[in-house]
Design a protein with these regions (language model features):
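Non-catalytic regulatory/interaction regions at protein termini and inter-domain linkers
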Residues: 1-20
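Sequence-level detector for tyrosine residue identity
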Residues: 8, 25-28, 66, 120, ...
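Juxtamembrane extracytoplasmic/periplasmic/luminal helical "stalk" adjacent to the first N-terminal
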Residues: 16, 20-112
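Residues embedded in well-ordered secondary-structure elements
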Residues: 69, 124-126, 228-233
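Extracytoplasmic/periplasmic sensory segments of membrane signal-transduction proteins
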Residues: 77-211
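Structural recognition of the beta-strand scaffold that forms the well-ordered cores
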Residues: 136, 255-256
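Extracytoplasmic/periplasmic ligand-binding sensor regions of membrane-associated signaling proteins
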Residues: 179-255
Length: 256
């Protein structure tokens, strides 16, 4: 009887171990089956189709974004060139009417203010038509050549929007960021709280290169700058610099 009892006890002791092994075996079989199903789906492309579709959609969106950016930059370049030509013609007409040479504008703040007022219209019209936050021109003259670093100062007019929200131009206020105080008052322009009468060309990327341009085609003198922080503001911008030529082809300043 003892051998039979011992055999029964050994069988009972082995029972849970065999059950655990059977459960583990079934679990492994389920994992293998799931792995086989996933491998089949991936091999047939069922699972990869959404990924390919997403990748294609992103590629199309990227191409559309680049195309829209190129189109906008081309439009801005064309508008800036047209404005530069108008500024050059107005400058020639102003000097002819005054009977003075360009360099005689130096140290003559009243005449400079009068010129800035005349050049306001093409500047303002371009700002209203272009998709940009501001626009300005700088001429190679200054109201006071005796100031320190006077060689860096440029008489000019800088108009910008008071708010940079993406709204239509007619819904935004235009303020004077740079320009003679007399000009701003005569045009009834609000002056920026960090207003200055003239531009500092040393702080404008690309201005030296543009004013040194000696080519015959205005388009060849245009220059897009890298993204840069705009002085006295929190705004970061890309600048398009275009030379301003007089009737003789001499560079008299730059428009941005």
């Amino acid at each position: 009887m003892r051998p039979i009892r011992e055999a029964i006890q050994k069988k009972r002791a082995a029972g849970p171990s065999m059950g655990l092994r059977l459960l583990l075996y079934r679990f492994i079989m389920v994992l293998l089956l799931m792995a086989a199903i996933l491998s089949t789906l991936m091999a047939t492309g069922v699972l990869s189709h959404p990924a390919h579709q997403l990748s294609g959609t992103l590629d199309i969106q990227q191409r559309n974004t680049y195309a829209a950016l190129d189109s906008q930059m081309d439009a801005l370049t064309a508008q800036s060139m047209a404005m530069s030509e108008k500024l050059g013609k107005e400058l020639d007409a102003f000097l002819a009417a005054k009977g003075i040479a360009f360099d005689e504008l130096n140290n003559d703040p009243d005449t400079i203010a009068e010129l800035e007022k005349r050049l306001y219209t093409p500047l303002s019209n371009t700002l209203g038509a272009a998709s940009c936050s501001g626009i300005f021109f700088g001429l190679n003259v200054t109201a006071n050549t005796s100031l320190p670093n006077a060689e860096d100062f440029r008489a000019g007019l800088y108009l910008r929007y008071s708010g940079l929200q993406p709204t239509v131009a007619s819904e935004q206020n235009v303020i004077c960021f740079r320009g003679a105080a007399k000009t701003a008052r005569s045009l009834q322009l609000q002056m920026h709280n960090r207003w200055n009468p003239e531009l500092n060309a040393a702080l404008i990327p690309g201005s030296d290169q543009v004013t040194a341009y000696q080519g015959a085609r205005l388009a060849d003198g245009c220059l897009w700058t890298k993204r840069t922080e705009l002085l006295d503001t929190w705004e970061q911008v890309m600048l398009l610099c275009v030379p301003i030529l007089d009737g003789g082809g001499t560079v008299r300043g730059f428009a941005v």
